Amino acid sequence: MNNCLRALMMDPLLMGAFRMNLLTERVDIVKDLGWKRDEIAFNDSDMSHLMMFLERFYGLTNDKHIQRALDVVVTKNQYHPICDYLDGLEWDGQERIRYVLHHFLGADESEITYESVKMFLLGCVHRVFVPGCKFEYMLCLVGDQGAGKSSFFRFLAIRDEWFSDDLKKMDDENVYRKMHGHWIIEMAEMLGTASAKSVEEIKAFLSRAKETYKTPYAKYPRDRKRQCAFVGTSNKQRFLPLDRTGNRRFLPVQIDSSKAEVHVLESEDESRAYIDQLWAEVMVIYRSGEWSMKFRPEIAKHLDIHRLAFMAEDTTTGVIQAWLDNYKGDYVCSRLIYNEALKNYGDPDRKSVNEINDIMNNTIDGWLPGPSSHRFGAPYGSQRAWHREGVKEPVPDKDGFISVAESYDQLKIPFDV
């Protein structure tokens, strides 16, 4: 094996030819070795040519020794093509993060668009420099077919082999292999046709930092830290399911191709040069260390409001909010809302209670959950309650209850319950 090592490391032709690609986790041949090749990755044909070369010039024929020597050589000679690309960029000082989606796709030049794009691009960079880092966001472009959404993401990935749109189903047994070796992965229209259950699966999928699986010829499974980021495209405006917790992993941006300065495919060279400088700007921010993988609280709040325009319509919230805006009391409970606001009779079932709690805790303006149980009087009795924002919480009695009968008496019950 030592003789094989010497040949691979000292022969003028072979020296430096073999490198371990940390993105694909495959051996790459990075120089011309004199035989015809169709791809950079080392394959069975390359091994045959290498063995023939070593036998002819060095008399080395033990294929196991050659393979082990090659493993040692590439372990010492690793590289990451995306990191090398990013490290080699030099920014010209012109701001592009703020304008890129307007330039190519006609998106508004809003602060929300800027913060969403910046977060996503920094996440892409962080994922290749720190594989497996926590990054849960998906940038979603929403707009007409033919606007160039997928082409933009393909160009954003720089090389076609660093981009994939082959991830169609979350339950595909080959889903992890389809992710491997790619930087930006598009889930085209997956959200637009997804059910609430499948969207929850997508959220869980986005939250993972690694995959554990065994390749076909490996003996044991191993952890593979994620180096990719996910993007979404949709022609459907309200592509997000109703989720009153906010669908926070998704960063939707509305595009309008009629307002774009240029179509991304109009001049490929100019588009790619623009995107090179986009990544150069991102790297200046990344190297500064003045960034975070979390949105500032005020931006996160605006994003929650922004996402509502892309979610399925929430009619129940509107009914409850309108009723509360005209309600004279300062305290409400779920059963009171069920009977009075939603005009239902009797006791609510668990599903209805959970929905009301979800609405009151996440989407209603001007009301806060109270820390104690409240006595509402007949027919509601003691209930967990919400109080009007700005109302000072009274002191609970010795049993931990607060009487709100006076507020409740202001209501006129139009029916028996």
Feature map (PLM): residue ranges:
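AAA+/SF3 P-loop NTPase mechanochemical coupling elements
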Residues: 175-180, 215-233
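Conserved alpha/beta core segments of nucleic-acid transaction machinery
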Residues: 285-329
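Conserved catalytic/switch belt of AAA+ P-loop NTPases
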Residues: 199-222
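Conserved helicase/translocase motor-coupling segment
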Residues: 324, 331, 336-358
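A short helix-turn-beta junction within AAA+ P-loop NTPase domains corresponding to the substrate/partner-engaging
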Residues: 240-260
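N-terminal nucleic-acid engagement/recognition segments and initiation subdomains in replication
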Residues: 1-95, 111, 115, 346-351, ...
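Conserved AAA+/SF3 P-loop NTPase catalytic/coupling segment centered on the Walker-B
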Residues: 183-206, 241-246
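P-loop NTPase catalytic core of nucleic-acid-dependent motor ATPases
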Residues: 70-180, 184, 335, 342
